[in-house]
Design a protein with these regions (language model features):
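Flexible "cap/lid" subdomain of the alpha/beta-hydrolase fold that forms the substrate-access gate
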Residues: 1-8, 12-175
Length: 175
């Protein structure tokens, strides 16, 4: 049983760590956020903001708000999904300016090509492990994290008046 913790979070884990540190100062002694900086709670929820900003073109977080449609797309061919998403998120994908399609009614994977050959930084066994895990769990749990943003925004009004007071650091990379 521990009395204090240091939190480290990447991507979705970063805002969860930042907010936990702000809410639980007695228990969190330091916090590290990777890729996503600390931001205060906005006047509108992030999903409402995304819907306004991306009214006429595709944005993955808006797409993930739909129920069942993203799950069907992502779970149709797990190997293809995992390969495309890892490539899309890689430095090579970024350098090649891989983007999802900008058509409003498209799916996430529509604008992402399959990588040409094997990814240099990822073993085939790692892709297959991810395929097996998502075959068991599906994508609903991961997508529900995106769908919970409005609920978080409504229930965490207390964050309006809180700051990160612990030692903290934000780390980002170029690619």
């Amino acid at each position: 049983h521990y009395k204090k913790a240091i939190l480290i979070g990447h991507d979705w884990g970063a805002p969860i760590c930042w907010n936990t540190a702000a809410l639980k100062t007695k228990f969190i002694s330091a916090v590290v956020g990777l890729s996503v900086p600390y931001t205060r709670r906005g006047k509108i929820s992030s999903t409402e903001l995304w819907q306004k900003l991306y009214k006429k073109r595709f944005f993955y977080q808006n797409y993930f708000q739909k129920h069942y449609i993203p799950e069907r797309e992502l779970e149709k061919d797990l190997y293809k999904t995992i390969s495309k998403v890892y490539y899309w998120c890689s430095a090579e994908g970024f350098i090649n300016r891989i983007k999802t399609t900008s058509e409003l009614d498209s799916g996430l994977l529509d604008g992402i090509p399959m990588p040409k050959g094997k990814l240099k930084w990822l073993k085939e066994s790692d892709i297959l492990k991810s395929v097996l895990e998502f075959k068991k769990s599906g994508f609903k749990g991961a997508l529900n994290r995106y769908r919970a943003q409005n609920l978080d925004w409504k229930q965490l009004k207390v964050l309006d008046n809180l700051n990160i007071i612990q030692p903290s650091i934000f780390i980002a990379g170029e690619y």
